[in-house]
Amino acid sequence: SIKDVVELLNSEQHNSKNILMTTGSKNIPEYVYITDYKERVYLRLLPNPEMLQSAIEAGIMPSHLIGMQGPFSQELNEAVIRQFNIGVLVTKESGSNGGYEEKVSATENTGIDCIVIKRPVEENGVSLPELIKYLKTKGL
């Protein structure tokens, strides 16, 4: 969860590193709970005026907003990491459409940490006792 990520970013391991948030605009209000967020948090988001305004209103510095439309290559991710002296990249487990692999490869090539917000587990199916009960009702 984003709250777990904020806690991790505030831990001794990460609390002095610049952070590149590539998780979208939905969680912007949570970023203010990151220690020294005005200096450390860089936010890459769509160049949508409403999203940019909400980030500014939440206290993210305009100089720390990177308004870009993806998808982004590994090389572009690496360039952003170097340009802003990023030490931690935060991403969602988004698959190929979200450029997940390119972000992870960029963190590996630049030697920085990558924090991945996993997708919620979708629980489809039935438990073993439910399956046994169902099979018994079918005479199997």
Where are the model-predicted features located?
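A C-terminal functional module that forms or caps the active site or interfaces directly
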Residues: 56-64, 68-79, 83-84, 88, ...
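Short, flexible loop segments at boundaries between secondary-structure elements
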Residues: 48-51, 113-125
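A short helix->loop->beta-strand "cap" motif at the edges of active sites that frequently abuts
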Residues: 39, 109-113
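Glycine/small-residue-rich loop that forms an oxyanion/phosphate-binding "nest" at active or ligand-binding sites
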Residues: 1-9
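Structural motif corresponding to alpha-helix initiation and N-cap regions
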Residues: 2, 74-75, 125
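Short glycine-rich anion-binding loops that position phosphate/pyrophosphate groups of nucleotides
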Residues: 25-27, 94-96, 120
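Binuclear metal-ion centers of metallo-dependent hydrolases, dominated by the metallo-beta-lactamase
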Residues: 124-140
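Anionic-ligand binding region
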Residues: 18-65
